[in-house]
Amino acid sequence: MITIDGNGAVASVAFRTSEVIAIYPITPSSTMAEQADAWAGNGLKNVWGDVPRVVEMQSEAGAIAAVHGALQTGALSTSFTSSQGLLLMIPTLYKLAGQLTPFVLHVAARTVATHALSIFGDHSDVMAIRQTGCAMLCAASVQEAQDFALISHIATLKSRVPFIHFFDGFRTSHEINKIVPLADDTIRGLLPHEEIAAHRARALNPEHPVIRGTSANPDTYFQSREATNPWYNAVYDHVEQAMNDLADATGRHYKPFEYYGHPQAERVIVIMGSAIGTCEEVVDELLTRGEKVGVLKVRLYRPFSAQHLLQALPDSVLSVAVLDRTKEPGALAEPLYLDVMTALAEAFNQGERETLPRVIGGRYGLSSKEFGPDCVLAIFNELSAAKPKPRFTVGIYDDVTNLSLPLAENTLPSTARLEALFYGLGSDGSVSATKNNIKIIGNSTPWFAQGYFVYDSKKAGGLTVSHLRVSDKPIRSAYLVAQADFVGCHQLQFIDKYQMAERLKPGGIFLLNTPYSADEVWARLPQEVQAVLNQKQARFYVVNAAKIARECGLAARINTVMQMAFFHLTQILPGDSALMELQNALSLIHI
């Protein structure tokens, strides 16, 4: 197994299944393009033994145009983008879909700038292209992002319909997790070689000329447009077959629509994206309380198969909440809600369902707004109400239009072996240090490790909070650590600015980087911090990381010192092993 972030997992598959990669980096998809460029520069090869050609264009519009041109020559091509970059590609996406040209665009889904720009994640960009004719496949985790990257490349070649493979920006693209990698032999064995040959045979060639991109008149345009229906009708089966083939090769099973929960559920949430893992955890907890609940995971969003959605939804369901991670001002409701509602209403009208469940729709997670177990519990509580809100928001307090749901106070019991928080200053190395910690734990122990990093849009100087989990089982928790076993404050100036001690579990470890000794530091702490540390019976430690860094010739970079202190205090790795692994990690970084 490997410890990697979502972008790295996707880029690895895209690189190995492509021949031409046109890029123009945009947050949060940038590292996919950057890694592909670096790999090509270092001579890494795809599964056919060739080095893909990576070219950076002047904009995202140029990148998708270069992809279009490469595809017309019979090459296998891909690109990566987000947000406004995706919007610039819309005209070419229409052309690619209309010409039934197979390719995959990997999207780290991000907020589209409206009243303000935001670099953070939601589905407002991918929802703006749902009408282009591209198929849309959504991954919910780092493991799924890797696997669905390959499934997309297989399904697009089988169906000839271009695919948008998307996953939540930052929450999945930048989350580090431990996954099972796809080997070259597995990828090579699953790719459809006959369809690749057919794609090459369709290349524009003066030896056997064809005409494309014509201007059509009213006498033929409509008929030609409808003639693509059979290709779209077959997409679901191609995706399902690709998922089945992947399951045979790897043992990991997926379905385009997958239900999780009580077989006779009465309340069900329909959702797609990273929030699925959070919903699954809440469902597991509610099932132990005897509640009949479930979550329906939407993976293949376009083409939307009403038939298979309804097959996955339990017949016993009485109320359904459909969640969208986007806002469409002026619309009757958000996109996924409208699709689900239409599917249910048509089935009821045609006599395929005896009853029509009550369906409500909600918005959540815009611009990476936190969506935790308390939000999921609030939604299930709303579904139990006699008259639930038909439209709602969750995760915020809406005192303007009063659409928000009151959040539940009870939270889920933690199943992690260790949960930790690290507070640092942008560019002080805290985030990089935590990434090293996660990879060291993931790669040198049998445990699963997860890391997520919260920071603002500034390049340097802002607060960074790194969230680390270690568990015996795969980690589905796509939300922030609320209560930690270990809290590290890497900057003394934060001690009276942020509520860090409040985030500590009873009996947890609080580590403070300070120039003051253990004898004098307590008197310098704010009384509120002293009170919280006493109340929680915290184990309080101090380290003069700046002094140690200077003595070791590290200048102001305290991150390595804080890393070693973390391993020493938590004993998640024995001291000698931690030191050796840390030295190896640093040697790789600085080669």
What are these regions (language model features)?
Residues 3-9, 244-267, 280, 403-417:
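Glycine-/acidic-rich phosphate or pyrophosphate-binding loops and their flanking alpha/beta elements
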Residues 119-169, 193, 346, 350-365, ...:
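Conserved thiamine diphosphate
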Residues 1-128, 133, 150, 388-390, ...:
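Thiamine diphosphate
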Residues 48, 52, 163-259:
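Conformationally flexible catalytic loops at phosphate/diphosphate-handling active centers
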Residues 20-56, 249, 263-264, 268-299, ...:
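Anionic-ligand anchoring segments at beta-strand to alpha-helix junctions in alpha/beta enzyme folds, i.e.
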